[in-house]
Regions:
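Sec-dependent signal peptide recognition
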Residues: 4-11
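Low-complexity, intrinsically disordered or signal/transmembrane-proximal segments
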Residues: 13-16
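N-terminal Sec signal peptide cleavage junction
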Residues: 22-24
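Ser/Thr/Gly/Pro-rich low-complexity, disordered linker/stalk segments of secreted
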Residues: 27-35
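Alpha-helical substrate-recognition element adjacent to the catalytic core
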Residues: 37-247
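C-terminal cap/substrate-recognition subdomain and adjoining C-terminal extension
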Residues: 40-48, 161-364
């Protein structure tokens, strides 16, 4: 029914318009409910999250949002103070396919990129072989400053805009361990749904990650509605292509200059460094923190310094839909319980991970 709204003062006509509009909305709603299109928008908040546990993370999050958005309540938090920080790998995006995406990109650069592999140094090859060794046995490599430095070095002289396209081209290939999915599509659907739900409730979202900032921005693009300035990752030195060996204090950027990587690491954004970058780039203590490992505990502790703060950690306990690790998940859950972090079980709290059409490859 088409309703033309005239700006009359007449109360009776206005009331008639409202009733007709309401009837149209009911009809549209019924038609929408009868639509079998699998891409329809779910109206239920966090519909991809399980309801099996009344005390589970879904109920905790929904109740929390209700409390902090109630302007008449004691726990109301103004919109400008609603900040949530998310780790990336293992929190929003898969880290076991079979290892971190930026690590796989690094191995490709060293082992397979015909424009670079012959230039790779012994240090870079050693770091790539270490990453490959752990990936082959289904483990994540230990945190290693030497590896982080090597990962910065391989992009020396690459333009900033080039690494974006370089990453995009790599992640546009089929997933290594899953059917019906590309490398860049391995986002956890329940977490994407959570981010959108928080945004609808006026949360400002930041990604605080150990992945290189520029690589992460390329991966996130097209999947999440998050500004590039809100993606805070591992930091490397950026220079002008005409700067050569001059310090930034001794060089003035020119209109025809372009930005490129110097190939030097500034800081790997893990542990206390996450707190540093949150303080430096955001300037406020977040309300919510989401992570999946001990390297996220520092920003979790920071969030818990907020009077209304909460910290959540994801457990890698799904060994059917994901490449989980039950022993690791159990140990981490015990640690989370001791520190009052709320745990999210990939196995129990998510109805799906990547979508029903995505399956693990037999040999993965």
């Amino acid at each position: 029914m088409l309703i033309i709204k005239f700006r009359f003062i007449s109360f009776s006509y206005h009331f008639y318009s409202v009733i007709c509009s309401w009837e149209k909305e009911k009809k549209d709603s019924r038609n929408s409910n009868n639509d079998n299109n699998s891409t329809k928008i779910e109206t239920e908040p966090l519909s991809l999250w399980s309801d099996f546990d009344n005390d589970g993370p879904k109920k905790i999050i929904l109740n929390y949002i209700k409390e902090i958005t109630d302007e008449s309540g004691a726990d109301y938090v103004p919109k400008e103070d609603r900040i949530a920080v998310f780790d990336f790998d293992g929190t929003l995006f898969q880290e076991t396919d079979p290892t971190y995406c930026d690590h796989k990109l690094y191995m490709y650069r060293v082992f397979n990129d015909t424009d670079y592999k012959d230039k790779a140094t012994d240090k870079q090859k050693e770091a790539a072989n270490t990453i490959k060794y752990y990936a082959d046995i289904g483990k994540l490599p230990p945190l290693d400053l030497k590896t982080a430095e090597a990962m910065a070095e391989v992009y020396k002289d690459m333009k900033v805009n080039e690494i974006y396209e370089y990453t995009k081209k790599y992640i546009d290939q089929p997933s290594d361990g899953y059917n019906n999915m590309k490398r860049g599509d391995v986002f956890y659907k329940p977490m994407l749904e959570l981010v959108e739900y928080l945004q609808k409730n006026d949360f400002i979202i930041y990604i605080v990650t150990g992945t290189d900032t520029y690589v992460c921005r390329a991966i996130v693009d097209g999947h999440m509605n998050i500004p590039e300035s809100h993606i805070i990752g591992t930091e490397t030195i950026i220079i002008s292509d005409n700067q050569k060996d001059k310090d930034g204090l001794d060089y003035k950027y020119l209109r025809n200059d372009t930005l490129q990587f110097k190939g030097e690491l500034i800081s790997k954004n893990l542990n206390m460094n996450k707190v540093y970058y949150i303080t430096k780039e955001i300037g406020e203590i977040p309300l919510l923190s989401f992570g999946n490992s001990g390297s996220d505990s520092s920003m979790a502790e920071l969030a818990l310094q907020n009077p209304h703060g909460m910290a959540f950690m994801i457990l890698c306990d799904d060994i059917e839909r994901e490449r989980g690790d039950l022993e690791k998940a159990k140990s981490f859950e015990e640690s989370c319980n001791k520190n009052n972090y709320i745990t999210i079980s990939m196995r129990d709290d998510w109805k799906t991970i990547y979508g029903e059409n995505v399956t693990r490859k037999i040999d993965s």
